[in-house]
């Protein structure tokens, strides 16, 4: 049976990178975290990603080495086609996805896709954006506005206002609940 592709999305500052790093440390033999291939330096930001030049990115895209790819914020992002092998082998795969490209992921993966949307209250999101120090006050206001306006449909919601441990536990609880609902539908 194929695994599930967990498409983790949320506004900038919602804690996706921290959650993914914590999931990598958690003992769970059937869960793999996909790296993103990104056209930005390896040491830019906190995401554990594979840095590519635009030339490298386009070469890989032409060779169909990305299962999914998109362009946002003057940067190219890709999820390697290796996730298809992992899913076929029965592993669940978590990918740092894009809210704006959720429809693309749904189109390609259908019922295998399990979107999880990180939800963070505006005060917590503001605090996180200010603490990381990458954006000025205007950019933070724009990010907060965008976060309030864009809420994907048909997404499991994970509140990420609390501790990282709470979020990891809630992540696995959501997956178990989703699996139980799917099993009930088969009966």
UniProtKB/Swiss-Prot annotation:
To which protein family does this belong? Belongs to the ribose 1,5-bisphosphokinase family.
- Binding-site residues for ATP, renumbered to this chain: 10-17
Q: Tell me the superkingdom of the source.
A: Bacteria
What InterPro entries is this protein classified in? GK/Ca_channel_bsu (IPR008145), P-loop_NTPase (IPR027417), PhnN (IPR012699)
Give the UniProt keywords, A-Z: ATP-binding, Nucleotide-binding, Transferase
Q: Top-down, what is the taxonomic lineage of the species of origin?
A: Bacteria, Pseudomonadati, Pseudomonadota, Gammaproteobacteria, Enterobacterales
So what does this thing catalyse? alpha-D-ribose 1,5-bisphosphate + ATP = 5-phospho-alpha-D-ribose 1-diphosphate + ADP
Q: Which SUPFAM superfamilies match?
A: P-loop containing nucleoside triphosphate hydrolases
GO molecular function of the protein, one example? ATP binding
Q: Its pathway?
A: Metabolic intermediate biosynthesis; 5-phospho-alpha-D-ribose 1-diphosphate biosynthesis; 5-phospho-alpha-D-ribose 1-diphosphate from D-ribose 5-phosphate (route II): step 3/3
The protein's name in its UniProt record: Ribose 1,5-bisphosphate phosphokinase PhnN
EC main class here is transferase
UniProt record, GO biological process: 5-phosphoribose 1-diphosphate biosynthetic process; organic phosphonate metabolic process
Q: Give the protein's biological function.
A: Catalyzes the phosphorylation of ribose 1,5-bisphosphate to 5-phospho-D-ribosyl alpha-1-diphosphate (PRPP).
The EC number(s) this enzyme carries: 2.7.4.23
């Amino acid at each position: 049976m194929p695994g599930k592709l967990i498409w983790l999305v949320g506004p900038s500052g919602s804690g996706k990178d921290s959650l993914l790093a914590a999931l990598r440390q958690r003992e769970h033999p059937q869960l793999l975290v996909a790296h993103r291939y990104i056209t930005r330096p390896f040491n830019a930001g906190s995401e554990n990603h594979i840095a590519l030049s635009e030339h490298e990115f386009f070469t890989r895209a032409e060779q169909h080495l990305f299962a999914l790819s998109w362009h946002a914020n003057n940067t190219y992002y890709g999820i390697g086609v290796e996730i298809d092998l992992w899913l076929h082998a029965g592993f669940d795969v978590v990918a740092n996805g894009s809210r704006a490209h959720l429809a693309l992921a749904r189109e390609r993966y259908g019922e295998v896709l399990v979107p999880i949307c990180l939800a963070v209250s505006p005060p917590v999101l503001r605090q996180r954006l200010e603490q990381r120090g990458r954006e000025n006050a205007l950019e933070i206001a724009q990010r907060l506005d965008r976060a309030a306006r864009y809420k994907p449909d048909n997404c499991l919601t994970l509140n990420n206002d609390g501790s990282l441990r709470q979020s990891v536990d809630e992540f696995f609880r959501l997956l178990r609940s989703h699996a139980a609902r799917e099993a009930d539908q088969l009966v």
